[in-house]
Amino acid sequence: MQGAGLVFQVCSRLIIKGEKMKSRQKVFENIIHGIFLILGLVAVAAVLLISVYLIVSGIPAIRKIGLVNFLFGKEWQSTAADPKYGILPFILTSVYGTAGAVLVGTPIGFFTAVFLAKVAPKGVRRVVESAVGLLAGIPSVVYGLVGMLVLVPAIRSIFGVADGSGLLAAIIVLAIMVLPSIIKVSLNALEAVPKEYEEASLSLGATPIETYFRVSVPAAKSGITAAVVLGVGRAIGEAMAVIMVSGNAPNMPSLFESVRFLTTAVASEMSYASGLQRQALFSIALVLFLFIMLINAALNFFLKGKKEKN
């Protein structure tokens, strides 16, 4: 009987200890969940604060200038006696520059990712991945400096123009800058495709190249699309490198003439702007912010549609 009582006491103590451990673990998990919730709310709050600040700061200028005159006006003379605040040249330049950079950078980045994921030997892959990582870590001002000292004179010499600064130089620099994002995200998407898909395709008689482009790439389409959209966001939001190679003049977009992007318009004038000019620059920032939001919304819509189809 004493032995049975001792066993009962030991078991009771173990049960109590186990319950205490579970209680402590639950408290710890609740604390961790609370921390994650707070961090998530901080991120959401930051976006909301930025949105509200841009709206409050940017709307007054649009009201004074007029939405149509602001968005579709072709002249920007913010320091003139009779100032004009038309940002159509900035919008078109940003759209053309971003589109050109993505059109140039996407094929290069995509095929590089396919090569690294499916074809490249380990040694070659290691070298290329190191180079891509280095590209991602180079500051924007270095891209702009190299573009200004090397690319702009080259364009001037090759095409025989008075000044090599312009939209073409900006497109080339931006195309190089978006490469790391496109390559890395596309590479991760391709590597996430199950090996069974490729093995099944090869067993049915398909060649490796056919398997890569008819099986692996379609299966990784969502990730590759995300890579392109990230590249768009990177290109449309760049300022420092662009301001150094584009000429930064408020002209309508032209490959060989100085142009100004939405980002460079804000960066070049905000330091000395005041009054309506300063408000107009906040309005430009608001337009740029809305562009980025639309791009993200389009990406989420596309990815959601793909998931529902699958």
Region roles according to the model:
Residues G133-A175:
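Generic hydrophobic transmembrane alpha-helix motif, especially the helices
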Residues P139, L204-G205, P218:
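Glycine/proline-centered hinge or cleavage motifs at structural transition points of membrane proteins
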Residues L187-E191, K195, L202, S271-N310:
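C-terminal transmembrane helix and the adjacent membrane-cytosol boundary/short C-terminal tail
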Residues H33, I108-G147, N310:
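Cytoplasmic-entry segments and transmembrane alpha-helices of multi-pass inner-membrane transporters
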Residues I87-F115:
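Transmembrane alpha-helix signature in integral membrane proteins
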Residues V242-F289:
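Interhelical loop and adjacent transmembrane-helix boundary motif
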Residues V185-S186, P208-I243:
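Transmembrane alpha-helices
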Residues M1-G40, L299-N310:
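Transmembrane alpha-helical segments of polytopic membrane transport and secretion proteins
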